[in-house]
């Protein structure tokens, strides 16, 4: 990894001699480097120099604040902890797969893990903060392309992005969108993880930098219980009682407490309190408490 960064920094230094950021990128692209790689090189170089600042005093910013700031970012890692999302949240993700293909490397493939699964749905996807209008509703393991009404990512009578969402079941199959590449095999299933796979066609008017992808999702399906302490089918919920119960009992990302050791009637009572309707401003009726949280699993 160090060699890649060193090379990127070196190329960036050479490019910056042409003064502006835009000209620097054009310099890299004109040097015979494929556009996606040029963007990556420029991003790494810029990050390297922009972060080389004098050390400042530590005023005690909490880990929580740092985690909150990173929720909408795109990270690049193969060992980063995966968050749990309860309720409805807009999140970034972790790029676990990036590769180019095509005669001139004009296609960029990305596998972006959002959170632990299984989730209810991916409702919206944004590229560089622009909402993408798709050819149909986003659904699990369903291919979508950009609709012709989208002015940002539909160019020259063609979609620039193809996407497949994967909601993170434990029986999740290989993504055939990424599976067109030999490096994404039938063993790459990302079971139990909610992720989106994308294929992007290079267009200098649509992509001014390495794209940042975010998604509005309905998060983790959780198990609720009825008044007789009978478990219900796992479903999306923003009720804090059932979200807490899921975290306490989950063995993969939570505390792994056996359900037999949990006072289920107390959670049922608490869930009813949370679902109590109250009148907000404008006479709108809302629950007294909802949970729309992103949980940092590295602090388990």
Task: List the predicted regions and their residue ranges.
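Polar, S/T/G-rich
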Residues: 2-15, 29-300
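Hydrophobic alpha-helical membrane-interaction elements
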Residues: 24-27
